[in-house]
Each structure stands twice: as C-alpha cells, then as structure tokens.
Amino acid sequence: MGLFLQHKTDDIQWAVWKMEESLDALLALLPDARRVFCEQDLNRFVSERRKMEWLSVRVLLYAMLQEDKEIGYSPEGKPYLTDHSFFISISHTKGYVAVMLASFTPAGIDIEQYAQRVHKVSDRYIRSDEQTEPYQGDMTWGLLLHWSAKEAVFKRMENADADLRKLRLTHFI
C-alpha cells in the first residue's frame, strides 16, 4: 500500500501517499460504489499522470477515514467534501499526493519535489523584505519550505485572488 506518512490529532489529520500502484490496483482499494464512480470519472482526464493523481487522492482519503467520501470543487477550484464533514486540502508533486483534513477550520497543505528550479522562480513568491534561510545548510530546501508554507496558507485562505508575494512570512523554521 502507498501510505507513506500519516499524522493525526483530535482536530486535524494529514497523510501522504506514494503513487506506486497501477490504476487498476488503486481502484481495487476503493469500496465498490466509489470504484464504479471513479472508473467513469477517470475518462475525463487524458494524462495518465493526472489520472493517477486524481485517483490516488481518493484512495488516500479512503485510507485516512475508512469511509467513502466524495470530493467536490468550488467554482474557484477549491476542494471540499460534499457532506461537509471536514475541511480538505489536497496537494501533489511528482510521485506523491497529500491530503489534509480539519474538523473546525479551513485546511492548507502543500508538498513539493526537491528541485533546483525553485531558485529561478523565487522572485514570484518571496517579498523583498522577507529573508529566506537555508534549511539544514541547504538553500534549496529553505526556498521550498518558504514556497510550501505560502502555498499552504494560500489554500487555507478564502480569497482566491490572494497573491503569494503579498503574504509575508517571518522566521518559521
């Protein structure tokens, strides 16, 4: 099974799924009714990668709760559980998906793949008055953590027009 990491408290839980299974193997991990729905809904995606991400999120959600839940999307693209039992946030990066559930407050989660490209785009999300520090001596990790923190805050916000450059982070590592 692809459950890679999981953390639970009374009000919040998050988990990360490593996408290693085939689409058929993922479908087999879902309850029968959800499997039928997912098989039909997968046809709207052309990309195999996108199919894997979409289905892995649903399998991870089922693994976390052991209950069948449906994910809907607001007009802005923000995910929600159709029964409103939890606030939900979703993230994916190469080979992994993450889901965060919160009982009483909007949730925000972000995962990023370690890559040097973060240096090239840092001016798109770091303000001139913010200081990004290396994490464990590695500036790439520092930039990725900064980006991820801002993405998680952005996902938690209700304002779809928020600009990451306007969010100011203080030292958080």
Language model region names:
Residues M1-I173:
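Core catalytic alpha/beta fold that binds nucleotide/phospho-ligands
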